[in-house]
Amino acid sequence: MQLTSFTDYALRTLIYLASLPKDELTNITEVTDLFGVSRNHMVKVINRLGQLGYVHTVRGKNGGIRLMKPASEITVGGVVRDLEPLDLVNCGVEFCHITPACRLKDKLAKAKSAFLAELDECTIESLLSDNSELLILLARP
């Protein structure tokens, strides 16, 4: 299963925000410069993260973005569920001759459940914990 670039950038953004001191604001330009992402794309990502309650946005000259809840409460699995279309096949959308005897759908459902269960064990905080190399890469100049 491949995550969309939207989810990839959302996870990177959450990791970066979690690396900052508690309640410290950053801005979209800083995030786009760090990850080399277009501003337009990142605005959409951050808006969606805000709608979902992951990111708090502050408007105005001294505004910015920060995590809305502790990184220890944000699981990678939760973010993926919120952002990804998780249907691996389009069973039921179109007629398929083998549907009555097909076992693939159940196998794919089990694989998806195992994938998400693994990601549910991982919080944004755990990705930073004891990871000094990552913290150095994320540090502001």
Curated annotation (Swiss-Prot):
All residue ranges annotated as the HTH rrf2-type domain in the record: 2-129
GO cellular component, one term: cytosol
InterPro entries xrefs: TR_Rrf2-type_CS, Tscrpt_reg_Rrf2, Tscrpt_rep_HTH_NsrR, WH-like_DNA-bd_sf, WH_DNA-bd_sf
Keywords carried by this UniProt record: 2Fe-2S, DNA-binding, Iron, Iron-sulfur, Metal-binding, Repressor, Transcription, Transcription regulation
Cofactor binding annotation: Binds 1 [2Fe-2S] cluster per subunit.
DNA-binding positions: 28-51
Gene3D superfamilies noted in UniProt: Winged helix-like DNA-binding domain superfamily/Winged helix DNA-binding domain
GO MF annotation terms: 2 iron, 2 sulfur cluster binding; DNA-binding transcription factor activity; double-stranded DNA binding; iron ion binding
Signal sequence interval, chain numbering: none
Keyword Ribonucleoprotein: no
Disulfide bridge partners, by residue number: none
Keyword Mitochondrion (UniProt): no
Cofactor(s) for this UniProt protein: [2Fe-2S] cluster
Gene Ontology annotations of biological process type: negative regulation of DNA-templated transcription
Residues involved in [2Fe-2S] cluster binding: C91, C96, C102
PANTHER family in the record: HTH-TYPE TRANSCRIPTIONAL REPRESSOR NSRR, WINGED HELIX-TURN-HELIX TRANSCRIPTIONAL REGULATOR, RRF2 FAMILY
Protein role: Nitric oxide-sensitive repressor of genes involved in protecting the cell against nitrosative stress. May require iron for activity.
HAMAP family assigned to the protein according to its UniProt record, in alphabetical order: HTH_type_NsrR (MF_01177)
UniProt-recorded name of the protein: HTH-type transcriptional repressor NsrR
Name of the coding gene: nsrR
